[in-house]
Amino acid sequence: MPAVIGGLLVAGQLLQFLALERGDVSVAVPVFGIKVVLVAFFTTLILAESVGARLWIAAVLSVAAVTCLNRRDANQPSRHVGITLLSGGLGSICFALFDVLVQKWTPAWGIGRMVPLIFFFGALLSFALVPFFRAPLRKI
């Protein structure tokens, strides 16, 4: 369970970094904002808990606010919209699942065991990225 959550953390980071590196920030950030709606959706789906209308409205308003705050000049074309939407959206799904699965599985494990294990597995999985580094770690 902690390995799954740690994997979601690493996958979400990779996907959202990809969206920012290859795409347009003004497109990526509003896509990241859908995480709030996805958490509400996965809460009903995975935790089988009802989410009230007030929370759904708040989630949708949050996405709208993030979108409005990240408007760009209409004269500038967006870069790589497809990869931005895909990787940003998948990253948001990973982070939303991370949030919901922490709520679901932590009571059985206890916070003192679950959180350190999540970050241990996240760090362990991150070592798989070392071959893809373009510069030595001391340059970072």
Where does each model-flagged region fall?
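Helix-coil boundary and interhelical linker segments in multi-pass alpha-helical membrane proteins
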Residues: 1, 42-55, 104-111
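Membrane-interface interhelical linkers
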Residues: 1-7, 11-23, 71-87, 123-140
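Hydrophobic residues within alpha-helical transmembrane segments
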Residues: 4-7, 34, 56-60, 86, ...
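Structural motif at transmembrane-helix junctions in multi-pass transporters
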Residues: 15-31, 107-114
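Alpha-helical transmembrane segments of compact multi-pass small-molecule transporters, enriched
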Residues: 31-45, 121-125
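Hydrophobic transmembrane alpha-helices of multi-pass small-molecule transport proteins
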Residues: 41-44, 54-73
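Juxtamembrane helix-loop-helix junctions in multi-pass membrane proteins
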Residues: 97-122
